[in-house]
Amino acid sequence: MGIRIEKAVPSDAAKLLEYLKQVGGETDNLTFGPEGMPFSVEAEAEFISSMENSIDNIMLLAKCDDKIVGCASLKRLPRRMKHRGDFAISVAKDYWNKGIGSQLLDNIIAFARENDFEVIDLQVRSDNKSAIHLYEKHGFEKIGEHPAFFKISDENIKFEYMYLLLK
């Protein structure tokens, strides 16, 4: 199984939207479910295009052959928070525990360092122990929690706030 990590390009838009529907249906750890993201292929391609040559944002895809099996992004925050980037990641369930999350995160951290980010922020479900372990392995620290970050079927879901100080 050869996994490639690549920057997303506009021609990935349709496959990325399908991937997001897939992973949204595999876990309750994401901000969306099996409906995926509410964007057209054209809108997604435009969004990817806006990130393509940016030093403020990046979207990476993990691919096995031509299939998207993971996605990670880092978006620089505005104005007085511009030293920080907000991080998001997902990996298809069939590819969990194969090092893909680590590969994506390594590449995101390298991009952040190269482009003068000082802090990477993320939020993670408190019961997502695998993800928390991945982040801690890469140097992230817990800095707080939110007792009702998600609400799924009338149940409040607790999240941890974590950050990685780069400078």
Model regions: which residues?
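Short glycine/proline-centered loop/turn elements that form peptide/ligand docking sites
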Residues: L105, N128-A131, A148-S153
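Conserved acetyl-CoA-binding loop-helix of GNAT-fold acetyltransferases
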Residues: N97-A110, E114, H133-K137
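Active-site acidic-Proline motif in GNAT/NAT acetyltransferases
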Residues: I89-D94, K98, S126-D127
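Conserved catalytic-core motifs of GNAT/GCN5-like acyltransferases
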Residues: D121-V124, E136, E141-I157
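A short beta-loop-alpha structural element at the N-terminal edge
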Residues: R4-E18
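Conserved GNAT acetyl-CoA-binding A-motif
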Residues: A112-Q123
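Acetyl-CoA-dependent GNAT
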Residues: P10, G24, P34-K93, L105-D106, ...
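Terminal substrate-recognition subdomain of acyl/acetyltransferases
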Residues: N156-K167
